[in-house]
Regions:
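A conserved regulatory-domain signal marking ACT and ACT-like small-molecule sensing domains
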Residues: 1-168
Length: 168
């Protein structure tokens, strides 16, 4: 088993941040394994999985010296994948925006023991009405025995106009 450092990063966006992170990790013999980054409201945020030697303190301390970024890390042990006990499903939602819609979706998914592995949300202006439309793309991990039709019906009950689609 290998030690992995899970690093979260947030700070004002600027050119060259990913290069700076990658160079710092490589300089301390860390191996960049996986990552996900995004720019929201002028802020750069993301998470990186780094294979490290030992406890990874050198890598984390070096990263924390990068000016203007709030960097935190958690050390873990990379485990081999266990037998499949869940199914991966993609979900797409579109409906009129309103306060609490993400909470309502998350509550229903938790009720069925469905884990949100990835969530992307955004707003757009409705083509006909000009009203704000809520969009969500989710990657979920659901128990093999969960009734996805029942989950679908419960999600549709959130609002009359909410379109719910399982994606391929």
């Amino acid at each position: 088993m290998n030690n992995v450092l899970i690093v979260s990063v947030i700070g004002p966006d600027r050119s060259g941040l990913v290069e700076q992170l990658a160079a710092t990790i490589a300089a301390k013999n860390g191996n960049w394994l996986e990552s996900s980054f995004s720019r929201l409201a002028g802020q750069f945020s993301g998470i990186v999985k780094v294979a490290v030697i030992g406890a990874g303190e050198e890598v984390l301390l070096a990263l924390q010296q990068i000016a203007g970024l709030d960097i935190r890390g958690v050390l873990d042990v990379e485990r081999e994948e266990t037998a499949l006990v869940s199914q991966s499903v993609a979900l797409s939602l579109i409906g009129h925006d309103r306060v609490g819609i993400v909470k309502d979706v998350a509550t229903i998914l938790a009720r069925f023991a469905v884990n949100i592995e990835k969530l992307e949300t955004w707003l757009s202006s409705g083509a006909m009405s000009g009203e704000m439309m809520f969009h969500a793309q989710l990657i979920l991990s659901a128990p093999l025995d969960v009734d996805l039709d029942q989950v679908h019906r419960q999600l549709e009950c959130i609002a009359d106009d909410l379109m719910v689609e399982w994606a391929d």
